[in-house]
A protein has these predicted regions:
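Short, small-residue-biased leader/transition segments that mark boundaries at the very start
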Residues: 1-8
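Generic structural signal for well-ordered alpha-helices
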Residues: 9-13, 35-39, 89, 112, ...
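Active-site beta-loop-alpha junctions enriched in small/polar residues
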Residues: 26-32, 52-56, 105-107, 128
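Short beta-strand/loop segments at the ligand-binding rim of alpha/beta enzyme cores
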Residues: 18-29, 94-103
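Non-catalytic positions within long, well-ordered alpha-helices that form the structural scaffold/packing
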Residues: 16, 42-43, 116
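Glycine/Thr-rich beta-alpha phosphate-binding loop at enzyme active sites
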Residues: 37-98
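Alpha/beta catalytic cores of nucleotide-metabolism and tRNA/nucleoside-modifying enzymes
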Residues: 76-97, 101, 107-162
Length: 162
C-alpha cells in the first residue's frame, strides 16, 4: 500500500489543483492499509472518501479446467464483500476527519445501518438497485423506522458507535 499511497497522494494533489469543487476520492480495497491511504488523500485536499470498490476475485470452471472469466480475474461485488467493506469503513472513519461514504454489499436498510454504525457519513447502493429498483426507498423507510423504535432523534447519533 505504501507505493499505492504515493500514487493516491500525487493524483489527489493534481486533481485538487485543477478542481476547486467538492472532490470525493474512491479507495480500492485491494490494499494492505486503506486507512493510511485515506489519511494521505485527506492531507492532499480530498473532501471525502468513498469505499470500497470491488475485490479482486477468480472462479475456475473445473470441468473445462480453465478460468470462468476470459480476463481470468475480475471484480467481486454485492453481499459477499460487505464484511470487508464494513471493516474498512470502520478503519478509515477512525483515521480521518473528512466524511466517509460506505459502499459494498448494501442490500437492505440493516446493511446501510451497519455502515453508518461503523462510521459512514453516507452510503451508496449499487448491486441492490438491479434486484429491487426501489432499494433506496426501502433503506430510508427502514432507517426511519429503526430510529423511531430506538428513540433516535437523528441518524447521525448512530454514526461510528461501534
Amino acid at each position: 500500500s505504501r507505493g499505492l499511497g504515493d500514487v493516491y497522494k500525487r493524483q489527489t494533489r493534481a486533481c485538487r489543483r485543477a478542481w476547486p469543487r467538492t472532490m470525493i476520492v474512491k479507495l480500492s480495497p485491494n490494499v494492505t492499509d486503506i486507512a493510511s491511504i485515506a489519511c494521505a488523500v485527506e492531507a492532499e485536499g480530498a473532501d471525502s472518501v468513498s469505499l470500497i470498490n470491488t475485490l479482486l476475485g477468480m472462479a475456475v470452471d473445473v470441468e473445462r479446467q480453465r478460468p470462468v472469466l476470459s480476463t481470468v480475474t475480475g471484480g467481486l461485488s454485492g453481499p459477499a464483500v460487505k464484511p470487508v467493506a464494513v471493516r474498512m469503513v470502520w478503519q478509515v472513519a477512525k483515521a480521518v476527519k473528512i466524511p466517509v461514504i460506505g459502499l459494498g454489499g448494501i442490500m437492505t436498510g440493516a446493511d446501510a445501518l451497519e455502515f453508518i454504525m461503523a462510521g459512514a457519513t453516507a452510503v451508496q447502493v449499487g448491486t441492490a438497485n438491479f434486484v429491487h429498483p426501489d432499494t433506496g426507498t426501502r433503506i430510508v423507510d427502514y432507517l426511519q423506522d429503526y430510529c423511531l423504535r430506538h428513540g433516535v432523534a437523528d441518524i447521525s447519533e448512530l454514526r461510528g458507535i461501534v
